[in-house]
Amino acid sequence: MAKSIRKINLRKGKRRIPRGVTHIQASFNNTIITVTDVRGQVVSWSSAGACGFKGTKKSTPFAAQTAAENAIRILIDQGMKQAEVMISGPGPGRDTALRAIRRSGVVLSYVRDVTPIPHNGCRPPKKRRV
């Protein structure tokens, strides 16, 4: 006679994430928001392109705001209360994305600018002649 097989519940429950790290990567062409837990594992991400903005509209501050709201919305459902923010890049959406995160109700423990600054490294691209 065959033994009855115990069913194992493979579905994970909702992860509770009280603290997290929000990375804002603002380039001249797009803004990417990635939210990780304190160990560095990605919990949620969004970008202006993933929100439906195409071409030059991806580089607007409004697109960055929409991307930040989409990335944070998932985390509020998972119980995030406190976050650290790391901003990288010179793009136009960096301040607007930070403002959207502040308005979401998550308490920010600190905001750090981690933009890499060259000490006379690579030669910059040539100036545009339009």
Swiss-Prot record:
Keywords: Chloroplast, Plastid, Ribonucleoprotein, Ribosomal protein, RNA-binding, rRNA-binding. The keyword Signal does not apply. One of its GO terms (cellular component) is chloroplast. InterPro entries: Ribosomal_uS11, Ribosomal_uS11_bac-type, Ribosomal_uS11_CS, Ribosomal_uS11_sf. Gene3D superfamilies: Ribosomal protein S11. It is found in: Plastid, Chloroplast. The keyword Chloroplast applies. SUPFAM superfamilies: Translational machinery components. It comes from the Eukaryota. GO terms for molecular function: rRNA binding; structural constituent of ribosome. It holds the Pfam family Ribosomal_S11. GO terms for biological process: translation. Part of the 30S ribosomal subunit. Belongs to the universal ribosomal protein uS11 family. This is Small ribosomal subunit protein uS11c. It comes from Anthoceros angustus.
